[in-house]
Amino acid sequence: MASEHYFSASPGSELKTRTIRTRLAGHEVELTTANGVFSPERIDTGTQVLLASVPAPPPGGNLLDLGCGWGPIALTLALESPHATVWAVDVNERALDLVRANAEKMSIPNIKAATPENVPEDVTFMTIWSNPPIRVGKNELHNLLEKWIPRLEPGCDAWLVVQRNLGSDSLHRWLQATFPDEFAFVRASTNKGYRVLRGRRRSGMTGPIGIVR
């Protein structure tokens, strides 16, 4: 049923929460997840690869977790950058409720969990970390990235993790073709069948970006 997709705004299934224990930003934590969201049993492999690949986030400003699910990326950003404002953005209201609950449980005050339309249009980001919802379909995914990638601040980076057999390299080519002048996209790393793509807004670039083939 479409209502059961993790990218649905309001999952139709009865809420069934669970507690998982995991490690985020060097902290052993106990978090709440639920059915009707992405990877409720554990931190999925793609997100693990992303979190192991990215450098420390900027210490301040607005940071974005695009397609946040129950919140492992957003919570990591908030733990590593306690003086920043972390936007956890998802269409799934159940996922956003879980992000809020987990942030409260961990006494994290600097996360704003919001649907896309509730992020003010004038907010721009010092970094974007995302395990994007590939299964929404190519057109929806492209529309999503075309909306949010341009909200990156000059000289700042977006980090996307995509499974290779779900089109990471074709997405890389699309990003290069869609943002040929303003952004530089490269393959930053490859691990466990996933690519981590890095996109830097060209204005303010201070050096070369490495590439992994």
Segments and roles (model prediction):
Residues 163-180:
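Conserved class I S-adenosyl-L-methionine
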Residues 1-25, 36, 40, 212-213:
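N-terminal auxiliary segments of SAM/dcSAM-dependent transferases
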Residues 34-52:
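Conserved SAM-binding loop and adjacent beta-strand
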Residues 90-92, 140, 163:
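Short beta->alpha hinge that forms the Motif I/post-I loop of the SAM-binding pocket
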Residues 46-130:
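Conserved SAM/SAH cofactor-binding pocket of Class I
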Residues 155-162:
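Conserved beta-strand signature within the Rossmann-like core of class I S-adenosyl-L-methionine
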Residues 142-154:
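A short glycine-rich, Lys/Arg-flanked "PGG" loop and its adjoining helix->strand segment in the class I
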Residues 189-213:
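Core SAM-dependent methyltransferase catalytic element
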